[in-house]
From Swiss-Prot:
Belongs to the NrpR family. This is Global nitrogen regulator NrpRII. Gene3D superfamilies: mj0159-like. Under nitrogen limitation, binding of 2-oxoglutarate to the NrpRI/NrpRII complex decreases the binding affinity of NrpRI to DNA as well as the binding affinity of NrpRII to TBP and TFB, which leads to removal of the complex from the operator, RNA polymerase recruitment and initiation of transcription. Residues 8-247 are annotated as: NRD. Forms a complex with NrpRI and the general archaeal transcription factors TBP and TFB. Interacts directly with NrpRI, TBP and TFB. The keyword Transcription applies. The keyword Nucleus does not apply. Keywords: Transcription, Transcription regulation. It comes from Methanosarcina mazei (strain ATCC BAA-159 / DSM 3647 / Goe1 / Go1 / JCM 11833 / OCM 88).
């Protein structure tokens, strides 16, 4: 499908490309990670950073690391316009890139909204598969206003953004070892690792595979939106060196 030189790229293809280009090593805390990038009004920066800190400290993000790009500064081929500030989080697909580099043929399957009840993940209530859309599912679902991440923070029950990937069950030991390394590196967003040949949060898993659910890196952005602060988010925006990221507590 091509028109006027433009070729449609489904999200699954973009994910595979970013996974192969991810070089982050959790043991060395170095390499390139995938960044979710949002634009906000400069006047809202302090409020947004406060919200990000609240969400991240509650464990509803992939890592405690963020990137702030001031007006006039550039990130890749993008320059932040006057009156705006860029703010980025680590995308959960970075985890898939790390697993892939470890020789585990992981397959990101879908993004969706997970219902949480009293702090326990119950089920996916809305999902979009990566092969069926040209826009990141979490970006779409966030724009629909169907999350209630802020309510989850207040009451322990609500709807948060998350995504699901499958991996061969024979690689379970290697998966757990690599997830442990990521946990040591501050990647706290692993929501659930399912049993082989078992549905995960009510989603069926391919035979001889297991499912892994990870919190979406755009949950902090979803809370900003829920608070009525204008924010324009581009999930899986680009690759960036992990060394350019800062811990949220160093910024607030």
């Amino acid at each position: 499908m091509q028109k006027n030189g433009y070729r449609i790229q489904f999200t699954s293809s973009r994910i595979r490309d970013l996974m192969y280009r991810t070089t982050f090593d959790p043991k060395k805390m170095d390499g390139d990670i995938i960044l979710n990038l949002s634009l906000i009004d400069k006047k809202d920066l302090d409020d947004v950073l406060g919200i990000f800190k609240m969400v991240i400290s509650s464990g509803l993000s992939v890592t405690p690391y963020v990137k702030v790009i001031s007006e006039g500064e550039s990130i890749g081929d993008m320059t932040i316009e006057k009156g705006k500030v860029g703010i980025g989080t680590v995308c959960s697909i970075t985890i898939d890139g790390v697993l892939l580099k470890a020789g585990i043929p992981v397959n990101p399957k879908l993004g969706g909204v997970v219902q949480i009840r009293n702090g326990i993940p119950v089920r996916f209530t809305d999902v979009l598969t990566y092969v069926s859309t040209t826009v990141d599912p979490l970006e779409i679902l966030m724009s629909q206003g169907i999350t209630s991440v802020s309510e989850m923070l207040r009451t322990g029950s609500g709807k948060v953004l998350a995504n699901l990937r499958e991996a061969p069950m024979v690689a379970r030991d290697e998966i757990e070892s690599n997830l442990s390394d990521l946990l040591d590196a501050g990647f706290s967003g692993i929501l659930e690792v399912g049993e082989p040949n078992t549905r995960v949060l009510d989603v069926p898993i391919e035979r001889d595979h297991l499912g892994i659910v990870v919190i979406g890196g755009t949950n902090p952005m979803a809370v900003v939106q829920e608070y009525g602060i204008p924010i324009d988010t581009s999930a899986m925006s680009r690759l960036i060196s992990f060394k350019e990221m800062s811990r949220i507590e160093d910024l607030v």
